[in-house]
Amino acid sequence: YLRATFGNWNNLTSNLSKAIRKFLFDNEKKEYCKNLFGNPSDAFLSMITSKGIVNVLFEVAILRNKWKAHGGITSEVENNQRVLSLQKQLNELRKYIADAFDETTMLSPTTCSFEDGIFTFNAKQLIGARTPFNEITIKSLIPLDRKKLYLSNSQQTKPLELLPFIKFIEATDAIYFYTSIESKDVRWVSYHFDKEAELKQPADDDLFKAFEFLK
């Protein structure tokens, strides 16, 4: 994953989804598995382990490789046809996601207070393509690191820390995604901030620990 490819991520997604489904179908392991994900809704677990989503991702990878292999100048008709093909896959993806995120959100904690054993955090709610992101207040039984991102379920009080493949840059109010390591720097890309759509930053220990975790 030092030079991540679409195919590698798809294979990882497929393998993890299959493993999680096995845990969820095992009555002795189901609750343990749900707890690892912060006890989200059944709709959320169903979505992230969906065979349908994996199939869509593999289909898009096939299209991408096909178009890349036959590179060169393409006609407007061909370009329009490609857009229609991708829109079809996007609609399929939306169908599988549906309302799975209604009770689960990704957040970036900011300020905090502590009283009677409960942390009260202000946090950026990282939803959608429009910025600036909304600020919300959440209750938590555990401390949250403002340098990290979390998944928070509205019915739970222990947000789930995400692996550091997604980064929120507060100064630009933009989300960046890990793409590769080049020399000693990490390359990040954003779909929010066109003025600086790519970043290169020194790799840190947390990222390498995440790589070890995925082996």
Kindly give the residue locations of the regions a language model identified.
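Polyanionic, low-complexity intrinsically disordered segments
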Residues: 46-215
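Accessible peptide chain termini
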Residues: 1-2, 215
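Flexible secondary-structure boundary motifs
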Residues: 2-63, 92, 185, 196
